[in-house]
């Protein structure tokens, strides 16, 4: 593939921007993966890797996970903050604290811990805290405890502190402080406390409600003062060491981040005036990733990079400290999405294609109903030279005639053959109009979008949107989706992707299309009998954890892929995926009982013994098979 063709494909799918140097198109027109852009020779052809795995028994859909990307993301964020601190003469330290709620899988936690980079861990529940405490011995032992807490949660955190870890119990509501002080006295340990301040500043977009004055978490200004006085009276003011705030997840606009950090810096200054020696400044999450590749303020993009993010935070905190003669605190960010999103690709196969194939019908009979005659007249006019009617007018006329025919069909005026004739002619008209539209003409864009959606291929993909990409369904989040091969061809077709659940919501509604978002996906020409595999990218944050069991489709298989500079690749199975039996047990249906009940029914039939045994074996094999569609 020429460099010009490769450049065009990169622009079509915006790979150069959302791919972040981890994903690219190689000379074969295949997606390639480079888990560490600092080692460009270590890369793998993803399409070929999947085919090799399939030949070895790999089932699809499957998650292809690249732990080396996780480690590179952590190094990149740490490096950005190091540069910012050096640039602005910031004397405080920096810590990335990974909030495990983003992805609690062992491969993620342990890959980050073993990266050799400074790292803390954050927990938001008792279960998460237990996972964090068990792994804390492998890190520099910074633990941040967020979320609502009961006595057991608080005791666990204090036990971690007593074991020698730095465990910050962040006070989210005033009722927690009495329990903390009580349990600290019982355990004879000095608690290390934080306070989450509820800011007036708020981001925008799909996750804005997680920040601002209406946020679910945090203390208002009056409550912060109350907490300070409570601790002063208890002689524990020195325990309050961390200031925490959260603007929202996936912050698209750097200006919103800068505004929020400036407001929170005032809390830091005012708390010092009250005698509180805040040592850590936890800015929470918000560091976004560019799912669209548009470098914009849209909900699924960001208009900044790692360096600008780090510079804004370090400058704002440092400036407030210099202005008020205060020490530079240790800066903490809880950048889970930015660490994990890129490292996972869902790969699946297309199990069926429905194309809008058409043939131009012959002229209707002379005594055919008027609506059919009208459609034919419009079709003929479209091919007459010098016609003055617009493309839009032709399209509208044919749509009105087709609408009348559909209504007439319901009332018995038109036959099935006449309806089919009209629909074929309408598709022919749409195709003819499409050929004459100019994408550079702004007036044509709405018609182009309408026809692309009408004429798009329907691709039925072997996956559950609700299990593997729940945010695409729940909050209409966009994820990059494209074929793993055939990218050396011009994307002349359009497609929409549908999952295999029995739910009309199981469809992807938005796709990357150059610098914009479209309701159909650009597709290279392909063999409908052997369509390409598809990759759903940047699904490493939240999707595995939020996925639900709609239609009892379970977790997919997952493999960890390691790529080395000599071209070698190691693949480890990290999750075998759920069986049908696993999913049935989730809903209290015992597989053995079901098998017994089915066996009893089979025995009551008049089928011969051999056929009965065959049916029983098939039923049992299905129980312990994959929940997704499998090749025969």
From Swiss-Prot:
SUPFAM superfamilies named in the record: Alanine racemase C-terminal domain-like, PLP-binding barrel
Query: A GO molecular function for this record?
Result: arginine decarboxylase activity
Q: Reaction catalysed by this chain?
A: L-arginine + H(+) = agmatine + CO2
Keyword Chaperone in annotation:
no
Matching Gene3D superfamilies, A to Z? 1.10.287.3440, 1.20.58.930, Alanine racemase (3.20.20.10), Lyase, Ornithine Decarboxylase, Chain A, domain 1 (2.40.37.10)
Sequence positions bearing N6-(pyridoxal phosphate)lysine: 101
Q: Which UniProt keywords apply?
A: Decarboxylase, Lyase, Magnesium, Metal-binding, Polyamine biosynthesis, Putrescine biosynthesis, Pyridoxal phosphate, Spermidine biosynthesis
Q: What is its EC number?
A: 4.1.1.19
Q: Which residues bind substrate?
A: 281-291
Q: In which pathway does it act?
A: Amine and polyamine biosynthesis; agmatine biosynthesis; agmatine from L-arginine: step 1/1
Q: Which GO terms describe its biological process?
A: arginine catabolic process; putrescine biosynthetic process from arginine; spermidine biosynthetic process
Chain ranges passing through the membrane: none
Q: Which cofactor does it need?
A: Mg(2+); pyridoxal 5'-phosphate
**Is the keyword Secreted in the record?**
no
Query: Mind telling me which PROSITE patterns this protein's record contains?
Result: ODR_DC_2_1 (PS00878), ODR_DC_2_2 (PS00879)
**One family name in Pfam for this protein:** Arg_decarbox_C
* NCBIfam families in alphabetical order: PRK05354.1 (NF003763), speA (TIGR01273)
Protein family per UniProt: Belongs to the Orn/Lys/Arg decarboxylase class-II family. SpeA subfamily.
Recorded hits in HAMAP family, A to Z, give:
SpeA (MF_01417)
Task: Briefly state the protein's biological role.
Answer: Catalyzes the biosynthesis of agmatine from arginine.
Name of the protein this chain belongs to: Biosynthetic arginine decarboxylase
Tell me what organism the protein belongs to: Escherichia coli (strain SMS-3-5 / SECEC)
């Amino acid at each position: 593939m020429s460099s010009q063709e490769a450049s065009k494909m990169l622009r079509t799918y915006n790979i150069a921007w959302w791919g972040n140097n981890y994903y690219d198109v190689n000379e074969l027109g295949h997606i390639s993966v480079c888990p560490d852009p600092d080692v460009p020779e270590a890369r793998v052809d993803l399409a070929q890797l999947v085919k090799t795995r399939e030949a070895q028994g790999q089932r699809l859909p499957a998650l292809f996970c690249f732990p080396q990307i996780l480690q590179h993301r952590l190094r990149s964020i740490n490096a950005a903050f190091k540069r910012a601190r050096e640039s602005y003469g910031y004397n405080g330290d920096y810590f990335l604290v990974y909030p495990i709620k983003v992805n609690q899988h062992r491969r993620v936690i342990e890959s980050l811990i073993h990266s050799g980079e400074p790292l803390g861990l954050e927990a938001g529940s008792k279960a998460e805290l237990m996972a964090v405490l068990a792994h804390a011995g492998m890190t520099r032992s910074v633990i941040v405890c967020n979320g609502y807490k009961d006595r057991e949660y608080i005791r666990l955190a204090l036990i971690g502190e007593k074991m020698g870890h730095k465990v910050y119990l962040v006070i989210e509501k005033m009722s927690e402080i009495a329990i903390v002080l009580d349990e600290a006295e019982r355990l004879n340990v000095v608690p290390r406390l934080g306070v989450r301040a509820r800011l007036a500043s708020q981001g925008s977009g799909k996750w804005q409600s997680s920040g601002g004055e209406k946020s679910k978490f945090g203390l208002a200004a009056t409550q912060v003062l109350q907490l300070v006085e409570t601790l002063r009276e208890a002689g524990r003011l020195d325990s309050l060491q961390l200031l925490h705030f959260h603007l929202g997840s996936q912050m698209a606009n750097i200006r919103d981040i800068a505004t929020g950090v400036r407001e929170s810096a005032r809390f830091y200054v005012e708390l010092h005036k009250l005698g509180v020696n805040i040592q850590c400044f936890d800015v929470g999450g918000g560091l976004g990733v560019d799912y669209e590749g548009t470098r914009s303020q849209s909900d699924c993009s960001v208009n900044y990079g790692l360096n600008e993010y780090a510079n804004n935070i370090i400058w704002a905190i440092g400036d407030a400290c210099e202005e008020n003669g205060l020490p530079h605190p240790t800066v903490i960010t809880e950048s889970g999405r930015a660490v994990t999103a890129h490292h996972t690709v869902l790969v699946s196969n297309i199990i069926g294609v429905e194309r809008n194939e058409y043939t131009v019908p012959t002229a209707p009979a002379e005594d055919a109903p008027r609506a059919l005659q009208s459609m034919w007249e419009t079709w003929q006019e479209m091919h007459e030279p010098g016609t003055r009617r617009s493309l839009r007018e032709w399209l509208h006329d044919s749509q009105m005639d087709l609408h009348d025919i559909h209504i007439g069909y319901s009332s018995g005026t038109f036959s099935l053959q006449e309806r089919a004739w009209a629909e074929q002619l309408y598709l022919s008209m749409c195709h003819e109009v499409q050929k004459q539209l100019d994408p550079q003409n702004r007036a044509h864009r709405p018609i182009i979008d309408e026809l692309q959606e009408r004429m798009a291929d329907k691709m039925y993909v072997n996956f559950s949107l609700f299990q593997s990409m729940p945010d695409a369904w729940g909050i209409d989040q966009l994820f990059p989706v494209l074929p793993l091969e055939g990218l050396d061809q011009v994307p002349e077709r359009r497609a929409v992707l549908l999952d295999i659940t029995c739910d009309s919501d199981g469809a992807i509604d938005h796709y990357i299309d150059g610098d914009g978002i479209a309701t159909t996906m650009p597709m290279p020409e392909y063999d409908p009998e052997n369509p390409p595999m598809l990759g759903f990218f940047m699904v490493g944050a939240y999707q595995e954890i939020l996925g639900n069991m709609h239609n009892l489709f379970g977790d997919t298989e997952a493999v960890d892929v390691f790529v080395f500079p000599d071209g070698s690749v190691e693949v480890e199975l990290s999750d075998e995926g759920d069986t049908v039996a696993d999913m049935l047990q989730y809903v209290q249906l015992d597989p053995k009982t079901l098998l017994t009940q089915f066996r009893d029914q089979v025995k009551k039939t008049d089928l011969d013994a051999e056929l009965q045994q065959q049916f029983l074996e098939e039923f049992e094999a299905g129980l312990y098979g994959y929940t997704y569609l499998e090749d025969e």
